[in-house]
Amino acid sequence: MSKEAIIIQNKKRIIYEIYFPAFCRDFQDLANKIPYFVELGVTTLWLTPIFPSPTEHGYDIINHFDIKKEYGSFRDFDNFIEKAHENELEVLLDLVLCHTSSEHLMFKESIQGKNDCYFWSNHKLDDAWKICNENKQYYLAKWYYTMPQLNNQSAQVRTLIKVLIKFWLVEHKVDGFRLDAIKYASGDPIEFWKWFCKEVYKIKPNAYLVGECWEEFEISNKYAIETGMKTFNFEQAGWMKNKILHNSRYEVRNDINNAVIFLDNHDMTRISVDCNFNVDKIKNLLKLMFTFNHNDICIYYGTEIGMGVPNGYVHCGGHGDFHSRTKMNWYEVERQRRDPNSIFNYIKKLIHEYKSK
Protein backbone atom coordinates (compact mmCIF):
# COMPACT_ATOMS: atom_id res chain seq x y z
CA MET A 1 0.00 0.00 0.00
CA SER A 2 1.35 3.42 -0.93
CA LYS A 3 2.27 6.09 1.60
CA GLU A 4 -0.49 8.27 0.10
CA ALA A 5 -3.14 5.60 0.76
CA ILE A 6 -1.93 5.06 4.34
CA ILE A 7 -2.43 8.76 5.03
CA ILE A 8 -6.07 8.52 4.05
CA GLN A 9 -7.19 5.29 5.67
CA ASN A 10 -8.09 4.17 9.20
CA LYS A 11 -7.88 7.49 10.94
CA LYS A 12 -9.97 9.39 13.43
CA ARG A 13 -9.52 12.82 11.95
CA ILE A 14 -8.79 16.03 13.79
CA ILE A 15 -9.18 18.70 11.11
CA TYR A 16 -7.46 22.07 11.56
CA GLU A 17 -9.00 24.95 9.62
CA ILE A 18 -6.39 27.40 8.34
CA TYR A 19 -7.76 30.77 7.30
CA PHE A 20 -4.83 31.25 4.98
CA PRO A 21 -4.27 35.05 4.89
CA ALA A 22 -4.37 35.25 8.70
CA PHE A 23 -2.32 32.16 9.51
CA CYS A 24 0.75 32.33 7.28
CA ARG A 25 2.49 34.36 4.57
CA ASP A 26 2.76 31.73 1.86
CA PHE A 27 3.28 28.01 1.26
CA GLN A 28 6.92 28.10 2.29
CA ASP A 29 5.89 29.64 5.60
CA LEU A 30 3.11 27.08 6.00
CA ALA A 31 5.52 24.21 5.30
CA ASN A 32 7.77 25.54 8.06
CA LYS A 33 4.82 25.35 10.47
CA ILE A 34 4.24 21.62 9.95
CA PRO A 35 6.07 20.75 13.22
CA TYR A 36 3.42 22.86 14.98
CA PHE A 37 0.60 20.73 13.57
CA VAL A 38 2.46 17.57 14.55
CA GLU A 39 2.96 18.91 18.08
CA LEU A 40 -0.72 19.79 18.35
CA GLY A 41 -1.71 16.32 17.15
CA VAL A 42 -4.06 17.24 14.30
CA THR A 43 -4.32 14.90 11.32
CA THR A 44 -5.80 17.00 8.54
CA LEU A 45 -5.25 20.57 7.32
CA TRP A 46 -8.14 22.43 5.68
CA LEU A 47 -6.90 25.41 3.67
CA THR A 48 -9.45 28.14 2.96
CA PRO A 49 -9.39 29.14 -0.75
CA ILE A 50 -5.89 29.52 -2.17
CA PHE A 51 -6.99 30.43 -5.69
CA PRO A 52 -6.73 33.84 -7.42
CA SER A 53 -9.49 36.09 -6.12
CA PRO A 54 -10.15 39.84 -5.79
CA THR A 55 -10.93 39.45 -2.07
CA GLU A 56 -8.93 38.44 0.99
CA HIS A 57 -11.26 35.57 1.92
CA GLY A 58 -11.01 34.06 -1.56
CA TYR A 59 -14.51 32.62 -1.83
CA ASP A 60 -15.02 34.37 -5.18
CA ILE A 61 -12.62 32.45 -7.39
CA ILE A 62 -11.19 33.84 -10.64
CA ASN A 63 -9.32 30.68 -11.69
CA HIS A 64 -9.75 27.23 -10.11
CA PHE A 65 -6.51 26.00 -11.71
CA ASP A 66 -4.11 28.54 -10.22
CA ILE A 67 -2.78 29.82 -6.89
CA LYS A 68 -2.76 33.37 -5.56
CA LYS A 69 0.60 34.81 -6.57
CA GLU A 70 1.31 36.11 -3.06
CA TYR A 71 0.97 32.56 -1.70
CA GLY A 72 3.82 31.25 -3.85
CA SER A 73 4.37 29.00 -6.85
CA PHE A 74 3.09 25.52 -7.66
CA ARG A 75 6.54 24.25 -6.72
CA ASP A 76 6.07 25.79 -3.28
CA PHE A 77 2.61 24.22 -3.03
CA ASP A 78 3.83 20.77 -4.09
CA ASN A 79 6.73 20.96 -1.64
CA PHE A 80 4.27 21.79 1.13
CA ILE A 81 2.07 18.82 0.18
CA GLU A 82 5.09 16.52 0.13
CA LYS A 83 6.25 17.69 3.55
CA ALA A 84 2.73 17.35 4.95
CA HIS A 85 2.48 13.78 3.69
CA GLU A 86 5.92 12.94 5.08
CA ASN A 87 4.48 13.90 8.47
CA GLU A 88 1.26 11.93 7.87
CA LEU A 89 -0.87 15.04 7.52
CA GLU A 90 -3.71 15.23 5.01
CA VAL A 91 -4.47 18.43 3.09
CA LEU A 92 -7.96 19.53 2.04
CA LEU A 93 -8.61 22.39 -0.36
CA ASP A 94 -11.67 24.61 0.00
CA LEU A 95 -13.70 24.36 -3.22
CA VAL A 96 -16.41 26.83 -4.18
CA LEU A 97 -18.52 25.32 -6.95
CA CYS A 98 -21.84 27.16 -6.61
CA HIS A 99 -20.57 30.54 -7.82
CA THR A 100 -17.43 32.21 -9.16
CA SER A 101 -15.99 35.69 -9.29
CA SER A 102 -17.44 37.97 -11.95
CA GLU A 103 -13.82 38.26 -13.12
CA HIS A 104 -13.73 34.56 -14.03
CA LEU A 105 -13.00 34.01 -17.75
CA MET A 106 -15.97 31.69 -17.96
CA PHE A 107 -18.31 34.47 -16.82
CA LYS A 108 -16.79 36.96 -19.25
CA GLU A 109 -17.42 34.49 -22.06
CA SER A 110 -20.95 33.90 -20.78
CA ILE A 111 -21.66 37.63 -21.11
CA GLN A 112 -20.92 37.20 -24.81
CA GLY A 113 -23.23 34.20 -25.06
CA LYS A 114 -20.39 31.70 -25.52
CA ASN A 115 -21.50 29.24 -22.81
CA ASP A 116 -24.43 28.22 -20.60
CA CYS A 117 -22.41 28.20 -17.38
CA TYR A 118 -24.47 30.93 -15.67
CA PHE A 119 -28.09 32.09 -15.53
CA TRP A 120 -29.39 34.98 -17.65
CA SER A 121 -32.74 36.72 -18.03
CA ASN A 122 -34.10 39.67 -19.98
CA HIS A 123 -35.98 40.70 -16.85
CA LYS A 124 -35.16 41.18 -13.17
CA LEU A 125 -36.98 38.23 -11.64
CA ASP A 126 -36.16 39.19 -8.03
CA ASP A 127 -33.43 40.92 -6.04
CA ALA A 128 -30.95 38.09 -6.70
CA TRP A 129 -30.81 39.11 -10.38
CA LYS A 130 -28.22 41.80 -11.16
CA ILE A 131 -27.89 43.91 -14.28
CA CYS A 132 -24.89 43.38 -16.54
CA ASN A 133 -23.99 46.67 -18.21
CA GLU A 134 -22.19 44.93 -21.06
CA ASN A 135 -25.11 42.93 -22.49
CA LYS A 136 -27.98 44.68 -20.68
CA GLN A 137 -29.26 41.36 -19.33
CA TYR A 138 -29.71 40.18 -15.76
CA TYR A 139 -27.59 37.42 -14.22
CA LEU A 140 -28.31 35.39 -11.09
CA ALA A 141 -26.10 36.22 -8.09
CA LYS A 142 -27.52 34.89 -4.82
CA TRP A 143 -24.65 36.11 -2.65
CA TYR A 144 -23.31 39.37 -4.06
CA TYR A 145 -23.24 41.00 -7.47
CA THR A 146 -19.58 40.04 -7.94
CA MET A 147 -20.40 36.34 -7.34
CA PRO A 148 -22.53 35.06 -10.24
CA GLN A 149 -24.30 31.74 -9.67
CA LEU A 150 -22.91 28.76 -11.57
CA ASN A 151 -25.22 26.53 -13.57
CA ASN A 152 -24.34 23.23 -11.90
CA GLN A 153 -26.47 21.33 -14.42
CA SER A 154 -24.44 22.62 -17.37
CA ALA A 155 -22.41 19.98 -19.22
CA GLN A 156 -19.64 22.56 -19.69
CA VAL A 157 -19.50 23.25 -15.96
CA ARG A 158 -19.39 19.55 -15.12
CA THR A 159 -16.65 18.91 -17.65
CA LEU A 160 -14.62 21.70 -16.07
CA ILE A 161 -15.19 20.23 -12.61
CA LYS A 162 -14.06 16.76 -13.71
CA VAL A 163 -10.81 18.24 -15.02
CA LEU A 164 -10.48 20.28 -11.83
CA ILE A 165 -10.86 17.22 -9.60
CA LYS A 166 -8.11 15.35 -11.43
CA PHE A 167 -5.85 18.40 -11.51
CA TRP A 168 -5.76 18.77 -7.72
CA LEU A 169 -6.18 15.17 -6.55
CA VAL A 170 -3.80 13.54 -9.01
CA GLU A 171 -1.38 16.15 -10.34
CA HIS A 172 -0.99 18.00 -7.03
CA LYS A 173 -1.82 15.16 -4.65
CA VAL A 174 -4.29 16.86 -2.32
CA ASP A 175 -6.28 14.47 -0.16
CA GLY A 176 -9.76 15.86 -0.54
CA PHE A 177 -11.96 18.92 -0.43
CA ARG A 178 -14.05 21.03 1.92
CA LEU A 179 -17.10 21.99 -0.17
CA ASP A 180 -18.57 25.44 0.30
CA ALA A 181 -22.29 26.19 0.70
CA ILE A 182 -23.50 22.88 -0.73
CA LYS A 183 -27.22 23.59 -0.41
CA TYR A 184 -26.85 26.49 -2.88
CA ALA A 185 -25.90 24.33 -5.86
CA SER A 186 -28.34 25.15 -8.66
CA GLY A 187 -30.96 22.69 -9.84
CA ASP A 188 -31.14 19.63 -7.59
CA PRO A 189 -28.27 20.14 -5.10
CA ILE A 190 -28.25 16.55 -3.87
CA GLU A 191 -28.13 15.19 -7.43
CA PHE A 192 -25.20 17.50 -8.22
CA TRP A 193 -23.19 16.55 -5.15
CA LYS A 194 -23.95 12.87 -5.64
CA TRP A 195 -22.48 13.22 -9.13
CA PHE A 196 -19.51 15.19 -7.78
CA CYS A 197 -18.68 12.64 -5.06
CA LYS A 198 -18.93 9.80 -7.57
CA GLU A 199 -16.45 11.56 -9.86
CA VAL A 200 -14.05 12.19 -6.98
CA TYR A 201 -14.16 8.62 -5.69
CA LYS A 202 -13.55 7.27 -9.20
CA ILE A 203 -10.27 9.15 -9.24
CA LYS A 204 -9.29 8.77 -5.57
CA PRO A 205 -11.46 6.22 -3.71
CA ASN A 206 -10.17 7.30 -0.30
CA ALA A 207 -10.50 11.04 -0.84
CA TYR A 208 -11.98 12.95 2.08
CA LEU A 209 -14.99 15.17 1.33
CA VAL A 210 -16.83 17.36 3.82
CA GLY A 211 -19.59 19.81 2.94
CA GLU A 212 -20.80 23.00 4.55
CA CYS A 213 -24.57 22.86 5.01
CA TRP A 214 -25.65 25.51 7.47
CA GLU A 215 -28.92 23.79 8.40
CA GLU A 216 -30.42 21.66 11.14
CA PHE A 217 -28.88 18.20 11.45
CA GLU A 218 -31.62 16.28 9.62
CA ILE A 219 -31.05 18.34 6.48
CA SER A 220 -27.25 18.31 6.55
CA ASN A 221 -27.25 14.59 7.31
CA LYS A 222 -29.51 13.95 4.31
CA TYR A 223 -26.78 15.41 2.08
CA ALA A 224 -24.19 13.15 3.72
CA ILE A 225 -26.27 9.97 3.44
CA GLU A 226 -27.33 10.54 -0.15
CA THR A 227 -24.07 11.87 -1.60
CA GLY A 228 -21.29 10.05 0.25
CA MET A 229 -19.58 13.11 1.73
CA LYS A 230 -19.49 14.12 5.38
CA THR A 231 -21.09 17.37 6.55
CA PHE A 232 -20.38 19.85 9.32
CA ASN A 233 -22.92 19.64 12.14
CA PHE A 234 -23.86 23.27 12.82
CA GLU A 235 -26.78 22.29 15.03
CA GLN A 236 -24.59 20.36 17.45
CA ALA A 237 -22.19 23.30 17.73
CA GLY A 238 -25.12 25.30 19.11
CA TRP A 239 -26.17 22.52 21.48
CA MET A 240 -22.69 22.27 22.98
CA LYS A 241 -22.39 26.02 23.52
CA ASN A 242 -25.82 26.21 25.13
CA LYS A 243 -24.90 23.38 27.50
CA ILE A 244 -21.75 25.09 28.79
CA LEU A 245 -22.90 28.71 28.64
CA HIS A 246 -26.54 28.35 29.67
CA ASN A 247 -26.63 24.89 31.31
CA SER A 248 -29.14 23.69 28.72
CA ARG A 249 -29.84 20.01 28.30
CA TYR A 250 -27.38 18.27 25.99
CA GLU A 251 -28.25 14.93 24.45
CA VAL A 252 -25.62 12.73 22.88
CA ARG A 253 -26.82 11.56 19.48
CA ASN A 254 -25.82 8.18 18.11
CA ASP A 255 -26.95 8.87 14.54
CA ILE A 256 -24.29 11.37 13.55
CA ASN A 257 -21.68 9.09 12.00
CA ASN A 258 -21.56 11.24 8.86
CA ALA A 259 -21.08 14.52 10.73
CA VAL A 260 -17.96 16.53 11.48
CA ILE A 261 -18.18 18.16 14.91
CA PHE A 262 -16.87 21.68 15.53
CA LEU A 263 -17.40 24.76 17.71
CA ASP A 264 -16.42 27.74 15.54
CA ASN A 265 -15.12 28.66 12.10
CA HIS A 266 -14.33 31.65 9.88
CA ASP A 267 -18.03 32.63 9.62
CA MET A 268 -18.79 32.44 13.34
CA THR A 269 -17.94 34.21 16.56
CA ARG A 270 -14.96 32.55 18.23
CA ILE A 271 -15.73 30.39 21.27
CA SER A 272 -13.41 32.52 23.40
CA VAL A 273 -15.75 35.46 22.78
CA ASP A 274 -18.82 33.28 23.40
CA CYS A 275 -17.25 32.30 26.72
CA ASN A 276 -16.28 35.90 27.54
CA PHE A 277 -12.64 34.72 27.64
CA ASN A 278 -13.33 32.54 30.67
CA VAL A 279 -10.62 29.88 30.43
CA ASP A 280 -12.55 27.30 32.46
CA LYS A 281 -15.61 27.65 30.21
CA ILE A 282 -13.46 27.35 27.08
CA LYS A 283 -11.86 24.20 28.48
CA ASN A 284 -15.24 22.74 29.44
CA LEU A 285 -16.59 23.41 25.97
CA LEU A 286 -13.60 21.73 24.35
CA LYS A 287 -13.88 18.79 26.76
CA LEU A 288 -17.56 18.37 25.88
CA MET A 289 -16.72 18.26 22.18
CA PHE A 290 -13.98 15.67 22.59
CA THR A 291 -15.64 13.54 25.29
CA PHE A 292 -19.15 12.95 24.00
CA ASN A 293 -18.44 12.49 20.31
CA HIS A 294 -16.86 9.76 18.24
CA ASN A 295 -16.84 11.68 14.97
CA ASP A 296 -14.19 13.59 13.10
CA ILE A 297 -13.57 16.94 14.80
CA CYS A 298 -12.63 20.30 13.31
CA ILE A 299 -10.70 23.01 15.16
CA TYR A 300 -10.48 26.58 13.90
CA TYR A 301 -7.00 28.11 13.92
CA GLY A 302 -6.36 29.97 17.16
CA THR A 303 -9.00 28.09 19.13
CA GLU A 304 -6.17 26.12 20.71
CA ILE A 305 -4.94 29.30 22.42
CA GLY A 306 -8.32 30.90 23.11
CA MET A 307 -7.77 33.55 20.47
CA GLY A 308 -10.44 36.21 20.25
CA VAL A 309 -11.32 39.80 19.46
CA PRO A 310 -8.30 42.11 19.93
CA ASN A 311 -8.46 45.12 22.23
CA GLY A 312 -10.34 47.99 20.63
CA TYR A 313 -12.55 45.81 18.43
CA VAL A 314 -16.28 46.02 18.93
CA HIS A 315 -18.15 42.72 18.94
CA CYS A 316 -21.02 42.85 16.48
CA GLY A 317 -24.04 40.61 16.04
CA GLY A 318 -24.56 38.06 13.30
CA HIS A 319 -21.62 36.23 11.81
CA GLY A 320 -18.26 36.65 13.51
CA ASP A 321 -16.56 37.16 10.14
CA PHE A 322 -13.97 39.93 10.30
CA HIS A 323 -13.38 39.66 14.04
CA SER A 324 -12.79 35.91 13.76
CA ARG A 325 -10.18 36.23 11.02
CA THR A 326 -7.40 38.12 12.76
CA LYS A 327 -3.71 37.20 12.52
CA MET A 328 -2.58 34.08 14.32
CA ASN A 329 -1.00 35.05 17.64
CA TRP A 330 2.28 33.13 17.68
CA TYR A 331 3.51 35.02 20.76
CA GLU A 332 0.56 33.60 22.68
CA VAL A 333 1.43 30.10 21.43
CA GLU A 334 4.90 30.45 22.95
CA ARG A 335 3.49 31.77 26.22
CA GLN A 336 0.95 28.97 26.55
CA ARG A 337 3.52 26.29 25.70
CA ARG A 338 5.28 27.19 28.94
CA ASP A 339 2.08 27.13 31.00
CA PRO A 340 1.01 23.58 31.95
CA ASN A 341 -2.52 24.84 32.70
CA SER A 342 -2.99 26.66 29.38
CA ILE A 343 -5.71 26.00 26.82
CA PHE A 344 -2.97 24.98 24.38
CA ASN A 345 -1.65 22.18 26.58
CA TYR A 346 -5.18 21.16 27.54
CA ILE A 347 -6.34 20.72 23.96
CA LYS A 348 -3.17 18.79 23.12
CA LYS A 349 -4.09 16.36 25.89
CA LEU A 350 -7.70 16.10 24.65
CA ILE A 351 -6.53 15.40 21.10
CA HIS A 352 -4.11 12.69 22.24
CA GLU A 353 -6.78 10.99 24.34
CA TYR A 354 -9.36 11.24 21.55
CA LYS A 355 -7.09 9.64 18.98
CA SER A 356 -6.26 6.86 21.44
CA LYS A 357 -9.89 5.80 21.96
Where are the predicted features?
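Carbohydrate-interacting/catalytic domains
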Residues: M1-P52, D78, K83-A84, L245-E251, ...
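Substrate-binding/active-site clefts of carbohydrate-active enzymes
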Residues: K3-Q28, Y36-T43, I50-H172, W195-K204, ...
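Short, hydrophobic/amphipathic alpha-helical patches that form generic packing surfaces
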Residues: N284-N293
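Active-site clefts of carbohydrate-active enzymes
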Residues: D255-F277
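Soluble or luminal CAZymes and related metallo-dependent hydrolases
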Residues: D29, G72-D76, Q153-I161, D188-F192, ...
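Short, flexible loop/turn elements at secondary-structure junctions
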Residues: F20-C24, F51, K68, L97, ...
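Active-site-proximal helices and loops of the catalytic beta/alpha 8
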Residues: I81, H85, L89, F107, ...
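Hydrophobic faces of well-ordered beta-strands that scaffold small-molecule active sites
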Residues: I14-I18, L45-L47, V91-L93, F177, ...
